[in-house]
Amino acid sequence: MSHVALQGLRGAGDHRLVSVSSAAVGAPGSPRRYLHSLWLLSARDLRVRYATSALGYLWSVLDPLVMSLIYWFVFTQVFHRGAGEEPYILFLITALLPWVWFNAAVSDFTRAFNKDARLVRSTAIPRSIWVNRIVLSKGIEFLFSLPVLVAFAILAGGTVSWGLLLFPVAVLLQTMFLVGLGLIVAPLCVIWGDLERTTRLILRALFYATPIIYGVSDLPAPFDAISAFNPLAGIFTLYRVGFFPAQWDTLSVVVGAVVSVVVLFLGVWTFKRLERSVLKEL
């Protein structure tokens, strides 16, 4: 049954996605039906991404790994580094891995509806699924890359603290933040085409405005307080605190949690009001 649905996804405009029997995946509009379709779409994204690649899964690891090695070399071997903690390579990876997830997801949000316009118009499943499939597929790639974090934690002699228990909380908050952000960005990019290029520029600036190659505590006043209101600062703090307890910053964590929830609800509200406009533009 899943094979039939997946075949339907491979052909643009094919309606077989919605022909899966209710007995197998639930009645139309049911959570079970939604989750089943979400999984099929996410699995398709992963399959397409790696089907023509000789390295396959390794690509989800190479990007953050190469970035980490470059920054480690520049800031430890070329220039004197005054920020971050030791082992610095582990310090980098704990933030770069979730950043790659965030960056890849937001980049794909800008094409979420235009890429599969015919399916978006013709299928009966809720259209928010075209955003959530990106969050899920990129999130799975993030989870696949975690062995790199474990390997460097062992090789670099990193120590584990109680904060590691907050790692799942960070994943949950980032998922909520991305879903809300996607429900805002995706429809707006259909209505205003220039927003796709604008988003790329914002992401480039956001990388350096987010505590990745440095920590929140490394910033001088008043930039430390300003940075705390970047929701990614609090989320990335939760990822790091399991290996670097001194990186804990209550203000940034609270702000990250609150903003993630607010953006999620704002995204749902925005999407409901823009959905008709999106369908007219597609």
Features from the language model and the residues they span:
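Hydrophobic transmembrane alpha-helices and immediately adjacent juxtamembrane helices
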Residues: 1-282
